[in-house]
Amino acid sequence: MSCQKAVLELNIGSQLGPKSPERTEGVTAFEDYGTGLLENQLSVGDFVKIQKAFESPQPRKIICMSREDFTQKMTEIVGWGTKEEYGELFDKVDVAQDGFINWDKLTSFILLELYEQDERAKATVVPQWKDLEFLPVKHKDTIQKVIFLKNSSHYLTISKEGLLAIWGEHLKLQETFPITSDATKLKHLWVTSLVSLENVNKIAVAFTSKEVCFYDLLSKEEFACQYKLQGLKGTPICMDYWYDPLDANESILSFGDITGKVQAIAFTAALISLFERPASACEDGEATMTINWAELLSGCHKCCHILEHKLHQGDWVRQVTYNASLDAIISSTTSNTNSVVMAWREKSKKRLNMTSFNIAQGIHAFDYHSRLNLIATAGINNKVCLWNPYVVSKPVGVLWGHSASVIAVQFFVERKQLFSFSKDKVLRLWDIQHQLSIQRIACSFPKSQDFRCLFHFDEAHGRLFISFNNQLALLAMKSEASKRVKSHEKAVTCVLYNSILKQVISSDTGSTVSFWMIDTGQKIKQFTGCHGNAEISTMALDANETRLLTGSTDGTVKIWDFNGYCHHTLNVGQDGAVDISQILILKKKILVTGWERYDYASWKTIGRAITVFRPQNFNQFFIQPEEWKGGIQHHDDILCAAFLPPQTLVTGSYDGEIVLWNNSTENAHHVLHPDYQRLLKSKLDTKPQKLLSAGRSQPSHPMADHSTTGVRNFEIDTEGKNAVMRLCFLKARKNTAVTGGANLVSCGGSGYVRFWDIYKKQLLAEFLAHSGVGSIIMSTDKMNRYLTTGDLDGWLKIWNIEEYCLNSSKNKITKAPTLIRSFQPHEDRISSLEMCEPGGQLLIISSSADCSICVTGVCNAPVWIFGQAKHWHIENCLFLPKRDTNLVESEIQKEISLFSKEESCLDPTEHSLLNKKNKDDSTYNVRPSEDINLDIKYKERSTCMKETQKPYYGEVIKKSFSTFRSLNIGALEELPEVNKPAFLLDPEKYFRKEPEEERPQILEAPSLFKTLKAVFDEKNLFPKEILHHERKAKQLCQEKSCEVKKNKK
């Protein structure tokens, strides 16, 4: 069945073919490949007909067809095609020549054919490149290595003089560190190579002093050397690092030196420690530990062992790498003997087994494709050769086309293509299957003849780095034109929802703002060039949702109406370009947060981290900012902010700090961080405040990791792990200050979501929402029932947080809330999220860098894209989630119980002695187990009575009405016509006046008072037997009551 479904899904976009043999107009998905074969022209409807032909009325019975039966039935059932064509299809399916085929064989062949066509299509796609760009580097010497850190989405470059540069995800230079000490500079030592040890958050740097230093990225200091490996016999000039993704403790660091020696350190407990610390070592964790190479060779360190060989015999090792699929170390030199050496170790032997490739004139570099099992070599003889690792005699393919020696090669793994770069600055892209050059790029590279080139292709982001001495060039791939619908021409940056107009507002990097109808997806209007050519980074709506505020990278915020008229321009950057991250509109001010602008000319930081605009200044078009009284309390760029009425403001930054502010006084009073906490002293405070931790260098929590609580955490770690990208208050959770529980949610670095209690300054919960994708963003609905998170790969996850972290606890919760839905509506980074409820239906709106805006529901709803040809109708396609129906039922039950309580509380007009008597009698029927709760019940009853004794007539009517609200009152029936009675038609006949007659006098009765002789009493009125029986009954009742009282005592 899986094969059947797969075939139908793969060809879902095809059209039904005509029912005539002349099939001339049927356009299917397969015709895009330019093939006219029968199997490529069958549509979904044709496959459904063929499937029914193979179905048996008896369950679990497989129908097989011979060649004659198949050709005869197919021409009749499908309705087009010749018997010869179906016979050829039968022969292709019947590879084993059994003489018959069934449905499973047919679908397996079709799936394999589709897969091969898809692979061929990918291989022939030629990437389109943007213009060549040179990055503004600060390196003064040759760039030795470019690496990408997946954990933090940062690039690192290092140059020969030892300057390490840190680049952001968007290739903005953030910081530089001199990695060499003063003593090293005096010796004129150079950096030769750099590798990233991602599983342990370290980097290794090789020096010409025959040393390899290991630097901890999580160090409290700016850049601390943790291990120093010295005593090597030769200078290492190339390195490579590999770790097992299934067991991160297993890793291998390999390096080659100028003596032709290839060495490798195999770590067995990398997550615990790379090397064993001797007992005599200093207890200070930040002190550098020195390891001698001789110690490793002797086996003193049990957590690692050494592998090495000398087959290159004195030639410089230009490149070395360990490949897990081959389980071998591959190295290369520029010599024509032993140009490429593969070394591996068998389990029963200690020495390495080796095999070598002899390539004429040697090679400069190589690369290995594990799926194709090919080694590509960059030959000095202008040729690119493809080698089978197990065939050393000759290459399996030779790529001709370069007119100069090839200095770099690298596979485009996903497309099965190969890059090659030659000495004459010509870049070629090869189709491996056909061994043809499909693209030649000769950009305006630097014209210097003598240069050292570094080649690095980041396939995940489509970026190609080529260095020329100390210059770094970038070639970025253009996003390929796909069949996916685009909402904007450029990447979408922000999305908002206007609940009054029921419209979605979106912005992009091209300074365009678009308006969409949420009900149908139709575009209403569009504003272009809102900030010239500058990117719109964020937007906001005012409280009345009648004004739109747009923030741009040009350092301004503009206030618009919905007719496209700009009323004010807020000069945030003070005539300078700054990155605005968020606009927060409060009651009496507008806050703008963002990144500080660094002026490289003056080497100073310009601008404020928080900018405030007050309404009294809004009488002009250009409005200048005022001073934020709290000053700059963050140590890093502010990325987000949130406000909780009446006066709580929070801001989050790159280093993971969340600062709590008093919005009225504009003073900061506390700092939250996952690893430590500290208090900030306000300007208006006269008494010094006690710090929760003695500076930022000491953790406040006793269980805090010592490696993550530094004075100034290394920026890569803080941005990758704790960066706060979004903040959100859970405003629907009332009285959290009394009941406890989380009322603030933050998310960001490394895919973590954290729940905070700002009143107790406590981190209550932390869970990993998205793993291995870097930073994430989030949004929640107004009732705080659902939390939506989005990552850099376009994935969305919807979580149920209605019952999550409602109470405070001593231990931090690490269990994630219930995951309702996980899907991928976008192909690129999700830039903005918004949750709305038009018409009571909860919707999630997401925008992405793939130029699209999507809208969907909570539970398995379809995904619509704004801009698609077919409009939708939300009310006909979405339903409330099941969780909501349960909530409605529970609310109904709650209402019923409340109504019953209200009915038990009588109205003040209905109180009487009888009611008092009933209440007094009810106290004798109390169960023994409920005697303890009498006081509580009395208070509840009195409270209920107080509530009912409100002197409002409306309240009485409301409660009396609630008594009959369960009755089904229908429309009254129409009365039939009634004939008027005779006395109405002729009243004089029946009501005429009679003549008055004289009334007879009534005689008065004689008075009893005069004739009464004696007074009656009970003794004379009732018989004696009845009175005697009554006296005995009273005595018996009194005796019983006395006995009850004695028993109680």
From Swiss-Prot:
Function: Associates with components of the nexin-dynein regulatory complex (N-DRC), a key regulator of ciliary/flagellar motility, and might act as an inner dynein arm (IDA) hub or linkage.
Keyword entries, A-Z: Cell projection, Repeat, WD repeat
Family: Belongs to the CFAP337 family.
Self-association state and partner proteins as the record states: Associates with components of the nexin-dynein regulatory complex (N-DRC) and the CFAP184:CFAP263 complex.
Keyword Repeat in record: yes
Record keyword ATP-binding present: no
Annotated WD repeat ranges: 138-177, 358-397, 401-440, 487-528, 531-570, 633-671, 719-766, 769-809, 825-866
Annotated segments matching region Disordered: 691-712
Domain EF-hand: from-to ranges: 81-116
A cellular component term, taken from the record's GO annotations: cilium
Organism: Homo sapiens
Name used for this protein in its record: Cilia- and flagella-associated protein 337
InterPro entries, per database record: EF-hand-dom_pair, EF_hand_dom, G-protein_beta_WD-40_rep, WD-EF-hand_domain, WD40/YVTN_repeat-like_dom_sf, WD40_repeat_CS, WD40_repeat_dom_sf, WD40_rpt
Classification via SMART domains: WD40
